[in-house]
Amino acid sequence: MQQFFRPVIQDALRSAGIETGQPVQIEKPASAKFGHFSTNIAFLSAKELGKNPRTLAQELIGHLRFPSGSIEKTEVAGPGFINFFLTPPFIMDSLGEVLRQGEAFGRGTSGNGEKAIVEYVSANPTGPLTIGRGRGGVLGDCIANLFEAEGYSVTREYYFNDAGRQMQILGESVRFRYLERCGRKVDFPDTHYQGGYIGDIADRIYQEQGDSLADAEGTGEFKSTAEAIIFSSIKKTLERLGIRHDSFFNEHTLYTPDENGATRNSRVIDALRQKGFIDEYEGATWFLTTKLGQEKNKVLVKSTGEPSYRLPDIAYHLTKYDRGFGVIVNVFGADHIDEYPDVIEALKILGHDTSRIRIAINQFVTTTVDGETVKMSTRKGNADLLDDLIDDVGADATRLFFIMRSKDSHLNFDVDLARKQSKDNPVFYLQYAHARICSLLRMAWSENGFNPEKLPDLALLKTLSSPEELQLALALLDFPDMVRSALRLLEPQKMVDYMHSIAELYHRFYQECPILKAEADTANARLLLSLATRQVLQNGFRILGISAPESM
C-alpha cells in the first residue's frame, strides 16, 4: 500500500506549493482507531517551512486526490499526523491483485537488473560445518532471495579460504593421523584439529597410498586431499538446507603472481604505500590506521611473512569492484566486527565508493538440548555439527529458527522446541496455516465444486467486511512493503514476524468466519480470501527457503 499513498501525497505537496526536503513516510498506526495508514510529512516539514504542523496537515489534506471510493475519511491527529481510513470495498478490491499476480505478487523492480553480489558462509574447509556457520548461511541465502525479489541480478558467492595458517594446520593434522596408521608414534599437538573426521581422511589416504607418504616432505598431499573431501562435505550440507552458490572464489588466487610477479595482495600494499598508509617495522608490514584517528596501526603482513586477514579481504573486495557489482553484500559472523571497518577504510583510501558495500553481521549461536547448552569447538572435535541438527529437526525448522531472531541478537537454538509438532513450534505454526488452507480447498472442491484453477468473479471479495476479513486482507496487502523493508534492513527476521502475523490472522478468520457453510457468494468470497492468503504464504516461504506442505 506504500505505492498507493506515496504518489498521491507527493502530488498534493506539489499542488499545494509545498517544497520540503523530507521524504514521504507511510506508517501503520498502532491502533486501528487512528486509521489504516498515516503519514507524518506535515509534522516533519513544518519547522523548515515555518508553519504550524496541524495547519500544514489540514492544508495538505485539501490537495489530496485519491481514487473515488478508496478513502472513507482523512483526519489530522496529534501534532500533525494525517490518518487515512480506507473503505472496505477498496481494501477487498485491492486484494484481487494478489490472485491476479500470483507468484509475482511482492516482487519489485527497484533493483532494475543491477548487479549485486552476496557473499556468505565462506567457512574455512578445515572441518564439517557447525551450527554457528549455519546461521550465516541461511541469513545470506535469504538476503540473496530478497535482492532477487526486488529485481537485482544476484550472484551468490562463497569465498573459499584455501590459504593461510589454518589450512597448513589442517594438512599437518591429517599427516599426524596418517602416520599413526603407518605405525609411527606421533605426539599430536593440542593446537591441531582433533575431530574424528581427521582420522577418516587419514584412513582414506592410507587405503589409497599405503605407507608410501610416511617419509614425504611437507603436507601438500594431505592438505589438498583434506581440503577436497571437507569442501565436498560442506557443499552437501548446504544443499540439504537449500543454500546454493553461483560462484566460488579461491583465496589462493590472491597470492598468485601475474606476469610481472605481483599478486593481488602485493598490489594492495603498493597502492596503500603510494597513499602514505604503509610502513614496515618490527619485521611486519603495517596499515597506518593511526592516520585515520585509530589508536593503533594494523598488521597487514606478519613478521612470519603470513598476511593477516585484513590484506586478502581488501584484495578480495577489489575484485568485486573489478567485476562490476553495484551492490556488495557481506554476511559475516561476529568475529569480523573488529576487522571489517579497516577493510572499508582501505577501500576508501584507494578511491572506491564504499556506500555500495553493505554488511550483515550475525551474532553467535548456542544450542540447548533438554535445557542444557551444547558447547562447540571444531579443533577439539566436539563440535555441534549442522548435519546433526538437520537430521534431528529437519531443514525447514533449522532454516526458520536461524532467522526468527534479529541477526544482531545472540541466538539460542532451542532444539526441543524445534522438534515439536505443535503450534508452539514457529515453523509448524506457519506451515499449518498453509496446510489448513489446502485442506479447505480440497473440501471446497469435493463438496461445492470450487475449482482454484477457475476462479469465481473477484468482485465477490468486495462483499466481505467483517473485522477478521479486513484485518487479514490489509495484512496480505502489506507483503510487498514487507519485502522491501526486510531488504532495506538486511533482516529476514522481519519476514518471519510478518508471516507469523499472517498465519495468526488466518487462523482467527477461519475460526470466526464460516466458509463452506456460508451462503454461496460469501463462501466463494471467503475461499478467494483463503487463496490469497495461501499465495502470500507461498511467496513468503519461497523467500525464507522453507517448504509449503499441503497436508500435516
Swiss-Prot record:
Biological processes annotated in GO: arginyl-tRNA aminoacylation
Chief subcellular location: cytoplasm
PANTHER family, A to Z: ARGININE--TRNA LIGASE, CYTOPLASMIC (PTHR11956:SF5), ARGINYL-TRNA SYNTHETASE (PTHR11956)
Family to which this protein belongs: Belongs to the class-I aminoacyl-tRNA synthetase family.
One GO cellular component, as annotated: cytoplasm
Keyword set includes Cytoplasm: yes
Protein name in the entry: Arginine--tRNA ligase
Keyword annotations: Aminoacyl-tRNA synthetase, ATP-binding, Cytoplasm, Ligase, Nucleotide-binding, Protein biosynthesis
Location of the protein in the cell: Cytoplasm
Catalyzed reactions per annotation: tRNA(Arg) + L-arginine + ATP = L-arginyl-tRNA(Arg) + AMP + diphosphate
Matching SUPFAM superfamilies: Anticodon-binding domain of a subclass of class I aminoacyl-tRNA synthetases, Arginyl-tRNA synthetase (ArgRS), N-terminal 'additional' domain, Nucleotidylyl transferase
Entry-linked InterPro entries: Arg-tRNA-ligase (IPR001278), Arg-tRNA-synth_N (IPR005148), Arg-tRNA-synth_N_sf (IPR036695), ArgRS_core (IPR035684), DALR_anticod-bd (IPR008909), Rossmann-like_a/b/a_fold (IPR014729), tRNAsynth_Ia_anticodon-bd (IPR009080)
Enzyme Commission numbers on file: 6.1.1.19
Gene behind the chain: argS
Subunit structure and binding partners: Monomer.
Ranges spanned by the short sequence motif 'HIGH' region, renumbered to the chain: 123-133
Ligase recorded as keyword: yes
Broad enzyme group: ligase
Alphabetized GO MF terms: arginine-tRNA ligase activity; ATP binding
